[in-house]
Amino acid sequence: MSLNPALKFRDFIQVLKNEGDLIEIDTEVDPNLEVGAITRKAYENKLAAPLFNNLKQDPENIDPKNLFRILGCPGGLRGFGNDHARIALHLGLDSQTPMKEIIDFLVANRNPKKYIPPVLVPNDQSPHKKHHLTKEQIDLTKLPVPLLHHGDGGKFIQTYGMWVLQTPDKSWTNWSIARGMVHDSKSITGLVINPQHVKQVSDAWVAAGKGDKIPFALCFGVPPAAILVSSMPIPDGATEAEYIGGLCNQAVPVVKCETNDLEVPADCEMVFEGYLDRDTLVREGPFGEMHGYCFPKDHHTQPLYRVNHISYRDQAIMPISNPGLCTDETHTLIGGLVSAETKYLISQHPVLSKIVEDVFTPYEAQALWLAVKINTHELVKLKTNAKELSNLVGDFLFRSKECYKVCSILHEIILVGDDIDIFDFKQLIWAYTTRHTPVQDQLYFDDVKPFALAPFASQGPLIKTRQGGKCVTTCIFPKQFTDPDFEFVTCNFNGYPEEVKNKISQNWDKYYK
């Protein structure tokens, strides 16, 4: 039987194993910092995804055999072949699919006509219905929840799971990712902030006077396509389950929760159920985030998720994301998916759609940059200049209603010509440093809000003003705006004539024996 890595988490793991991209660690590993340190080393060196089969257990863990193992780096980069293999597998694509094609696949499949609703299946088709813990049996503090970073304010149980919430009128069921930290034996606290959909859905309950008891489910080890789409900036009100069905051309099987009316993926490792209490606020964080820092004194006041039921499968596996220095899931998923949605939105723009070929958030910039590749021959036809182009791009991506939420994480948009491969950071940074005049070729947008998690925003004056810090940088030579035949020779291998390059490539083994 063929494997389905997009819709079955264990199949995803098996494909990684089959392709030599999984390492099973049977040596005992302490979830207190050791798991985090190992995963960080794996991310930063593009090593195989680690599956921790033998976590150091609290003697009071009610079911140490099945609660639980940990999979690290599920969306990290691969160190051989196609580096984006794990992201491709999340979508059921061939593991050799490069990031540009992944982005194009997401753009091509954004059509709402292709949405396929989930299908409700019996509980016996759901492995996580095997074991159950009641409210009285639950003690989250006894589970092997990892302390991922040295500066974290607590143990973050939720870094790669999926929250499920539904509006009171049941018109919108939202699947999303937002971090969650163990607060006490039976509750989790996590970020419930704008522009996240979990905030918008829970706001509807608050407006109805029921903000203290909002039903939720927290699912771990969900279909990889589900966790990817849960990271996507899809339109408000859109249902992720239908979106996933459209992407995979197959309905997502779902089952009913045990203590509320929510439906969750049938293919889960663990499901926590309970209710979100927006009226009770507690200390949350800090947590090492996507930009590579943890500030120990930076904590927040956030609401509680009260857990009253846990269901789980045999030898359950909890996938985790350990954010930090590139490249991890906060870059490959969040940054990559912002690239896809931005490319789609640009394709709908009457002017930019004619000149923009590709967009990408380079990981080396921690998803704070967006590189935009411009067709310079089409650019000439616009009869514009650098300042006007920068204003057009920035006004649309930073200010417009369509793009504001999608591009909220971005602080600098970099425009380059079509000779640059924006997926190659070496080329991008070369163009950035040599083709723009600092300040002169940068247009600032001081009226837009900064991304609060960006370290220069959270640790500087922007945290008070909450305005500015964003710009568009034009790395296109002035003559390229007016002369379609403007020529320059790049002093690298690709700059040589084709016949010379072909001859060199054919005879390379003779030169370097």
Swiss-Prot record:
Gene Ontology cellular component list: cytoplasm
Active site: E289 (proton donor)
Binding note for cofactor: Binds 1 prenylated FMN per subunit.
InterPro entries: FDC-like, UbiD, UbiD-like_C, UbiD-like_N, UbiD_Rift_dom
Organism lineage: Eukaryota, Fungi, Dikarya, Ascomycota, Saccharomycotina
Keyword Hydrolase tagged: no
Recorded superkingdom: Eukaryota
HAMAP family for this protein: UbiD_FDC (MF_01983)
The protein's assembly and partners: Homodimer. May form higher order oligomers.
Record-given protein name: Ferulic acid decarboxylase 1
Reaction catalyzed: (E)-4-coumarate + H(+) = 4-vinylphenol + CO2; (E)-cinnamate + H(+) = styrene + CO2; (E)-ferulate + H(+) = 2-methoxy-4-vinylphenol + CO2
GO function terms (MF aspect): carboxy-lyase activity; metal ion binding
EC number: 4.1.1.102
Function of the molecule: Catalyzes the reversible decarboxylation of aromatic carboxylic acids like ferulic acid, p-coumaric acid or cinnamic acid, producing the corresponding vinyl derivatives 4-vinylphenol, 4-vinylguaiacol, and styrene, respectively, which play the role of aroma metabolites.
Name of encoding gene: FDC1
Entry coiled-coil feature ranges: none
